[in-house]
């Protein structure tokens, strides 16, 4: 699929702050970027990946930054919207759709099946499915793509080496939630556990996972929405509603970054600034 659509972006000013805002889509449907852990842009910022349900089902669209043109590139029945992860070199978008692991070429719209549930089951040694609405992870160098598979009692992290096209089951646990490769080395893969035992990092060299942060159970501490801070080997942790913490994945050293009710917090590429929305109350997006 490679269907060009007319540009529909517009500029306007925020009535309260006066900031100029660039609205990328105006179609009366749900249009959104990938989950906050995944980059929406390629590194060269030639296009932004948008999930749109303007056809009645979620599909992948590229918005060209040069002229605002939209290009639909997916042709599955429906894209699993939160699995979408663009590659940084701008060549591919990786995602699930129709119970398949896929990647689509951004230049041609040609899609390639990377894994089926039957192939995943052979890797896991039991019947599994690809859970809906769950994020995937692509390493910073675009080499490794990590996905999740689920059986009746276990969760698995499966990793594709995109150079050799070989899959490997690298981790299994009672639950595997969000995953993200460390931007400084693909050897570390953050694998969130359940909300009650959240922060785990898989050392892919040894196959061993370590809990790098222990929540305060007595005070019902809520840790969520973890993400790497580039250049630091640290994970930022939303300690909702009390602020943001950072923990070093090797030393376990903890520091506090912020003390407001951040919800989704993500760092810039340099690891020097973060942006975060806020939750209960919603007081807008903050930079820190």
Language-model segment annotations:
Residues 30-37, 57-98:
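Blade-loop segments of beta-propeller domains
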Residues 242-243, 258-288:
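Loop/turn-rich, solvent-exposed surfaces of beta-rich toroidal or solenoidal domains
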Residues 1-22:
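Blade/loop signatures of beta-propeller domains
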Residues 64-68, 106-109, 161-165, 203-207, ...:
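Short loop/turn segments that connect beta-strands within beta-propeller blades
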Residues 34-38, 79-85, 125-126, 131-137, ...:
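Repeated scaffold domains used in trafficking and secretory/extracellular systems
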Residues 27-32, 73-78, 115-119, 125-130, ...:
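Surface loop/turn motifs at the tips and blade-to-blade linkers of beta-strand repeat domains
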Residues 76-87, 91, 95-155, 170-176:
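Asp-box/WD-like beta-propeller blade repeats and closely related beta-sheet repeat scaffolds
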Residues 49-55, 93-106, 136-142, 146-152, ...:
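Beta-strand C-termini and the immediately following turn/loop, strongest in propeller blades
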């Amino acid at each position: 699929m490679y269907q060009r659509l007319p540009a529909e972006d517009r500029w306007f000013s925020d009535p309260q702050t006066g900031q100029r805002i660039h609205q990328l889509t105006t179609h009366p449907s749900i249009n959104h970027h990938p989950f906050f852990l995944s980059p929406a842009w390629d590194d060269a910022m030639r296009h932004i990946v948008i999930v749109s349900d303007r056809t009645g089902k979620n599909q992948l669209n590229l918005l060209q930054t040069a002229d605002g043109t939209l290009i639909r590139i997916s042709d599955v029945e429906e894209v699993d919207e939160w699995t979408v992860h663009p590659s940084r070199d701008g060549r591919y978008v990786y995602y699930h759709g129709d119970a398949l692991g896929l990647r689509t070429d951004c230049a041609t719209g040609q899609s390639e099946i990377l894994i089926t549930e039957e192939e995943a089951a052979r890797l896991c040694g039991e019947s599994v499915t690809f859970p809906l609405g769950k994020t995937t992870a692509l390493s910073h160098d675009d080499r490794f793509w990590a996905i999740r598979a689920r059986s009746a009692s276990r969760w698995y992290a499966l990793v594709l080496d995109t150079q050799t096209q070989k899959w490997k089951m690298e981790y299994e646990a009672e639950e595997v939630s969000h995953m993200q490769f460390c931007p400084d080395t693909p050897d570390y893969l953050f694998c969130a556990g359940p909300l009650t035992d959240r922060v785990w990092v898989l050392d892919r060299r040894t196959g061993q996972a370590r809990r790098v942060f222990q929540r305060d159970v007595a005070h019902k501490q809520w840790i969520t929405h973890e993400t790497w801070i580039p250049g630091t080997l640290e994970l930022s942790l939303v300690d909702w509603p009390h602020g943001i913490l950072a923990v070093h994945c090797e030393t376990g050293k903890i520091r506090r970054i912020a003390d407001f009710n951040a919800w989704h917090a993500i760092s810039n590429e340099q690891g020097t600034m973060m942006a975060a929305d806020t939750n209960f109350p919603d007081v807008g997006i903050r930079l820190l």
